[in-house]
Design a protein with these regions (language model features):
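Bacterial Sec-dependent N-terminal signal peptides
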Residues: 1-23
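Short S/T/G/P-rich N-terminal loop/turn motif that feeds into the first structured element of a domain
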Residues: 20-246
């Protein structure tokens, strides 16, 4: 139970003030319905979070998102943070574990536990937000081999530089799995306020960003340095749109 409740995905992520610490990390996990319906699980998670993960008395706050798209569409993502590794030294009480079993595990199977650590160098976060109510999460599984890792990192880094130079008002937070299983995965987290932002071809980055990028790096550079690099050095990109359940 301890492993199931303390494991975690998600970059993740309205605005919360970042507590002073050396790194930003979230524990995340997916919840797949197994018994009962959405209403029961949502109510159960809210009850558990309000009691044990409310951000008071030194506890990290927990959040729940509904996954609208991607490989886990129809499931939920539960995240707690920002948190520290040292927080894992504190053993959960019997009452805490029992409450999780009665209010969450009774209705859902947890899986996909990840410790998501934010990469500040690759992150562009103008408003210093930590958690987003609605987020687009892009996962990039990198092919095995240092040359593949370096190529994808450079592509992601150059986008961050372009966002800074253009002073974009759209954030893009970048996370890594602290304990990768197999190949490395870079997760890009884009907060959004309205689904209308996805009309047209915009998928996270600002509208017209490709033109802005090429004004900095040269004509054709976006396809060569981003699209072609991801095609050659990753195993594709998944898109998960998550909306917070309050």
């Amino acid at each position: 139970m301890l492993k199931r409740i303390t494991g975690i995905l998600i970059p993740l992520l309205t605005c919360a003030t970042l507590i002073a610490q050396d790194y930003v990390m979230f524990e995340t996990q997916y919840l797949e319905l197994t018994n009962g319906g959405h209403a029961q699980l949502q109510a159960g998670v809210k009850k558990h979070n309000d009691k044990y993960h409310n951000g008071e008395n030194g506890t990290a706050k927990a959040y729940l998102w509904y996954v609208n798209t991607g490989p886990y569409a129809g499931q939920y993502n539960w995240a707690v943070g920002p948190t520290k590794f040292s927080d894992k030294d504190k053993q959960l009480s019997g009452g805490h574990i029992k409450d999780w079993e009665n209010n969450v595990e009774k209705y859902a199977r947890s899986h996909g536990h990840i410790f998501m650590m934010r990469d500040e160098e690759m992150t562009y976060n103008p408003e210093n937000e930590t958690v987003g109510e609605n987020i687009l999460m892009k996962r990039i599984p990198i092919k095995n081999g240092q040359e593949h890792v370096e190529a994808v990192e450079e592509a992601v880094q150059k986008i961050a530089r372009a966002l800074r130079r253009t002073r974009s008002n759209i954030a893009r937070r970048v996370y890594r799995d602290a304990f990768p299983d197999g190949h490395q995965v870079i997760t890009l987290v884009y907060p959004f306020s309205s689904w209308s932002e996805f009309e047209g071809n915009v998928r996270g980055l600002p509208e017209g960003f490709q033109d802005s990028y090429e004004k900095i790096y040269g004509k054709g550079s976006f396809r060569k340095e981003v699209m072609d690099v991801l095609s050659a050095h990753s195993d594709g990109v998944t898109h998960e749109i998550m909306t917070m359940v309050k």
